[in-house]
Amino acid sequence: MDHLQRKLRDHEAAMFQQGFLDDQFSQLQKLQDDSSPDFVYEVITLFFADSDKLLSNMSHALAQVPVNFKQIDAHAHQQKGSSASVGAARVTSVCATFRSFCEAQNLEGCRRCLQQLQHEYTQLKTKLHYLFMLQQEIKAFGRSIPTRE
């Protein structure tokens, strides 16, 4: 295993250890094969596009007077589902808390959750972009992507 492969393996392991990713991400990786070598990247790219839109919608909805908590909850529910489907564990967890604040119609709690959600999402996005960059570098050298044990 060369330096880049080790770096990729360690980065991915850290994402799991730090709770950014869960087993659902591993399940996505198992669906990737020679016929769809960029499957995970494509799924995550769609997740990012949807998440960017949902976070914007939540931010806009929280700024409305009066606040429509049902609408915000629907956005948080959608974000929770898409996050869970790609294995974004920490984002999923914040969404669950966010939904509780929506149900309680706690505006300040919702605002804090949105900030936390944006923070967790930004961290995840940065870490996944780095993971994909390492994978591309490894492929460019004709090496195989190491699998997680």
Regions of interest found by a model, annotated:
Residues M1-E149:
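Two-component system phosphorelay core
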